[in-house]
Amino acid sequence: MQLNPAEISELIKSRIEGLTVSADIRNQGTVVSVTDGIVRIHGLSDVMQGEMLEFPATADGTPTYGLALNLERDSVGSVILGEYEHIAEGDTVKCTGRILEVPVGPELLGRVVNALGQPIDGKGPINAKMTDVIEKVAPGVIARKSVDQPLQTGLKSIDSMVPVGRGQRELIIGDRQTGKTAVAIDAIINQKGKGVSCVYVAIGQKASSIKNVVRSLEQAGAMEYTIVVAASASESAAMQYVSAYSGCTMGEYFRDRGEDALIVYDDLSKQAVAYRQVSLLLRRPPGREAYPGDVFYLHSRLLERAARVNEKYVEDFTKGAVKGKTGSLTALPIIETQAGDVSAFVPTNVISITDGQIFLETSLFNAGIRPAINAGISVSRVGGAAQTKLIKNLSGGIRTDLAQYRELAAFAQFASDLDEATRKQLDRGARVTELLKQAQYSPLSISNMAATLFAVNKGFMDDVEVKKVLAFEHGLHAWLKDKNAALMAKLEANKAMDKDAEAELNTAVAAFKKAFA
């Protein structure tokens, strides 16, 4: 068969016209070395700081990504997110042109996810409609609104003495095994029915501990409004470092849409250790306690994202869909100290960044005072303005009573005969200390807390035996619920007490005391 040259040229022309060539210009590099999850790459001249890099997939086809953290003259230092055993020298690495993003939105509520937002609870995929970058600039001064709404934790000692407001950063600090996680979990449980979405970020904890936390939240019915981000101790340092920022982005979704959210970082000491590990492997120069120079910035850029934003910010962000609403993200970071040393590098950093701290002490915990809050050095720098009026008016004397009690108790150890006034103060202090004890997973409503504080302030407990104080309190709450339900509902709704309510409460407590005796 002979082909006419004209036919051949026509055929070639038609083929060329029908050919679609998609030019995909992507920056590529070559793996030079792989050690402990850190990959050094030659090439990638256009890579951005914090950009996601695409590595060869695993044997089962799972994509492998890394973060570009060190940008040097002739190489790039990257940290792998996930498994890295299959990566070898000479492998090709591609830039993605994207910063690391995680899924966000209400679809994540009730789920347990890893640092990349992938589900790890065995309940199937998460069909989130949106993703967002994990690193964001915190809202500016103009976009913020002052903290003036309370975030009730349901714990008497916190809500009365170190109140937390919506949009505040309140540090929970203490040695290991002092009940830091318990305080944070109680705060999450107490948000039930209050329209606050919660995020619990577990960093570097045992998988069994995370499982126990999830079980506790499920039993309390709190998982339905909570996202758990878990980067357990068995995961890479990179995942532990990234997890806090992922959780923060998930919380910001609610803040930016005029809703309230609470985020717990448990704990930032382990995140700092993970970041130190990554930095040392990247051969960055070590500083104090071998932490890199930017460890302060590590935590400040994270915690500054917790804020209360004004109506204009929310309206601009939602393009007018949400009007007249403020949004807030409240942070409860946790720091673990070594033998009560709050002057170590990371604890001092986080204390200076946050708006106050709740200090938990081993000696109080071992003495059975739980939550083991040291009222003397625990402060809330902005929470006072946000405290519920009802609790604020009733709790004024509590802190003073405790401070005087601690001072006198130390003095009374050496004095044999005490005058009547001193003995009275010691007795009152012992009762207040006993009263501030609270069982785990049993947060109190505002009305019940008010009734307790009212009873102790008015001296109704002065002649009750110290060991019977908590029984008196439980009995009082049951009595008021049964006999004075309308009054309690009024206190809960108004969050304030007028003269009539005060007189009615006084009569009710007096009647209960007669029956209790």
From Swiss-Prot:
It comes from Polaromonas sp. (strain JS666 / ATCC BAA-500). GO terms for molecular function: ADP binding; ATP binding; proton-transporting ATP synthase activity, rotational mechanism. Produces ATP from ADP in the presence of a proton gradient across the membrane. The alpha chain is a regulatory subunit. It is a peripheral membrane protein. F-type ATPases have 2 components, CF(1) - the catalytic core - and CF(0) - the membrane proton channel. CF(1) has five subunits: alpha(3), beta(3), gamma(1), delta(1), epsilon(1). CF(0) has three main subunits: a(1), b(2) and c(9-12). The alpha and beta chains form an alternating ring which encloses part of the gamma chain. CF(1) is attached to CF(0) by a central stalk formed by the gamma and epsilon chains, while a peripheral stalk is formed by the delta and b chains. ATP binds at residues 174-181. Belongs to the ATPase alpha/beta chains family. One of its GO terms (cellular component) is proton-transporting ATP synthase complex. It is found in: Cell inner membrane. It comes from the Bacteria. The record marks 378 as: Required for activity. This is ATP synthase subunit alpha. InterPro entries: ATP_synth_asu-like_sf, ATP_synth_asu_C, ATP_synth_asu_C_sf, ATP_synth_F1_a_nt-bd_dom, ATP_synth_F1_asu, ATPase_a/bsu_AS, ATPase_F1/V1/A1_a/bsu_N, ATPase_F1/V1/A1_a/bsu_N_sf. It catalyses: ATP + H2O + 4 H(+)(in) = ADP + phosphate + 5 H(+)(out). CDD domains: ATP-synt_F1_alpha_C, ATP-synt_F1_alpha_N, F1-ATPase_alpha_CD. Coiled coil: none annotated.
